[in-house]
């Protein structure tokens, strides 16, 4: 049994009984902090959004629609807890560390190998096609130094994108469980990215539903730290 299997096994009884985790709008000190993420390529992002739309037929409304194509992502590392106003000096340090780490890796490829349930979400499961993703994760932790405190001692051992975060009752729990179970090994293709992004998240509740929109504070292409180092981030000078 792998980690994705264990998550499915853990989540199933919680969802069936209505005891699943529920997201709420972020507050200072909570989830959805400044993070380093990878985005799927556009074609893959559209496939993941389609999967989210199908999930919603069973989950119902009121959940966080994190699988929309311009929001879906793979988290490399969370860097702090949520705060409404970002610390510009911290952002400069995070960006510099991300650039240095990216210099040591090439494009990161992920095979999207199926869906699973977690206590608070529906996930797309991914397997790295080589060691670039793991190397970037390790290099980033090293380059952050003291700024690596948020995930100190934590080793992310799976790659995933959450396409729906539960935030309300699930309309058809049994139907959702069965639907995901039938797609545990559904191939959603391969995605590759040569760009890492430093992002913060903004909560929206509007005509498109409840969203967590990433705002790009900085980005860097793999192996190109030396070429980008002099440019500005959205939060200020590097």
Short names for language-model regions:
Residues 1-238:
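Histidine-dependent nucleotide/RNA phosphoesterase domain, centered on the 2H-phosphoesterase fold
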């Amino acid at each position: 049994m792998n980690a994705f299997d264990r998550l499915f096994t853990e989540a199933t009884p919680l969802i069936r009984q209505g005891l699943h985790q529920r997201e709420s709008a972020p507050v200072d000190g909570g989830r959805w902090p400044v993070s380093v993420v990878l985005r799927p390529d556009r074609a893959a992002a559209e496939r993941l959004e389609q999967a989210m739309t199908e999930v919603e037929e069973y989950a119902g409304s009121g959940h966080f629609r994190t699988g929309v194509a311009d929001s879906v992502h793979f988290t490399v590392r969370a860097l702090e807890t949520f705060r409404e106003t970002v610390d510009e000096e911290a952002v400069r340090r995070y960006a510099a560390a991300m650039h240095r780490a990216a210099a040591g890796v090439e494009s990161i490829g992920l095979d999207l190998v199926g869906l699973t349930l977690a206590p608070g979400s529906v996930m797309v499961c991914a397997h790295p096609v080589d060691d670039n993703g793991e190397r970037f994760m390790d290099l980033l932790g090293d380059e952050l130094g003291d700024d690596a405190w948020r995930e100190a001692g934590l080793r992310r051992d799976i790659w995933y994108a959450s396409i729906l975060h539960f935030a309300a009752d699930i309309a058809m729990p049994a139907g959702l469980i069965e639907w995901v179970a039938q797609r545990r090994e559904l191939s959603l293709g391969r995605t590759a990215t040569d760009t890492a992004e430093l992002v913060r998240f903004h909560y929206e509740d509007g005509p498109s539903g409840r969203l967590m929109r990433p705002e790009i504070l900085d980005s860097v292409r793999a192996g190109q730290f030396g070429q980008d180092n002099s440019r500005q981030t959205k939060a200020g000078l590097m």
